[in-house]
Amino acid sequence: MIKILNSKSKNFDLALDKLLLARKNKIKLSSVSVAKIIEDVKKNGDKAIIKYEKKFNKNNIIMPTSKQINKSISLLDEKVKKAIDLAYSRIYQFHLLQKKKLSNISYTDKLKNKLEYKYVPLESVALYVPGSTVSYPSSVLMNAIPALVAGVKRIIMINPGQQGKQNSAVLYAAQKCKIKEIYSIGGPSAIAGVAYGTKKIKKVDKIVGPGNSYVAAAKKCGISEIYSIGGPSAISAATYGTKKIKSVDK
């Protein structure tokens, strides 16, 4: 439900301050909770991850089998597959052209010092793809394809599901991007798992992709290199003399 504040109301300033304070307190609270989860995963590894998966996602599976993945993909509507195929080809073409525009620099100065500037792909990267009750195959494509084009050797996906079941469209997009290492986990514990590494999860060099406020808080802890702190999408709209407020929420 969208929150509407009327600037003409007598209590507008107070209501706005209250809203901003509540958001600030939520961020502080999530940061404290996240720090405890990260420390738990650091000490107890897979055991801690499973504990939080059971608690938040009713899941006790860290890594789905190939059979489970293929079965899920087989249930996906062909129209959705074609849409993902089209998006993949367009995004891939763009980043391929982008790569061709990049050039290394190498020269020797008057003092015979050889100076170089090189573009070198990372060894490994983890894509965080939000899940549970929603589907974001676009997050897979937008984050995996640049890594694929760059030549990153190991691309893994962490995507929370409900009771171990992940979204078919997300899994198909991952398959399209040649991602063979897929984990059915999410939240701060997943971020900590790929950042520190566990017995089942090998650590990565970088973590990319959006997430909720708790995932964003985990990234802020500086436990791994990140692309950005992509938290939940938010919008604040100011309207003047219009009654079509509901249209903003669509």
What are these regions (language model features)?
Residues 108-172:
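Conserved small-residue-rich beta-alpha loop and adjacent elements
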Residues 178-250:
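Conserved NAD(P)+-binding/catalytic subdomain of aldehyde/semialdehyde dehydrogenases
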Residues 36, 40, 51, 83-86, ...:
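Alpha-helical scaffold segments in soluble metabolic enzymes
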Residues 1-123:
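N-terminal Rossmann-like NAD(P)+-binding subdomain of aldehyde/semialdehyde dehydrogenases
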Residues 23, 38, 130-134, 155-161, ...:
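Flexible, glycine/proline-enriched loop segments at strand-loop-helix junctions
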Residues 121-130, 174-177, 198-201, 222:
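Glycine/charged-rich beta-loop-alpha catalytic/anionic-binding loops adjacent to active sites
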Residues 29-32, 36, 44-47, 79-82, ...:
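Conserved active-site and cofactor/substrate-binding residues in soluble primary-metabolism enzymes
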Residues 57-58, 163-164, 190-191:
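Short secondary-structure capping/turn micro-motifs that flank functional sites
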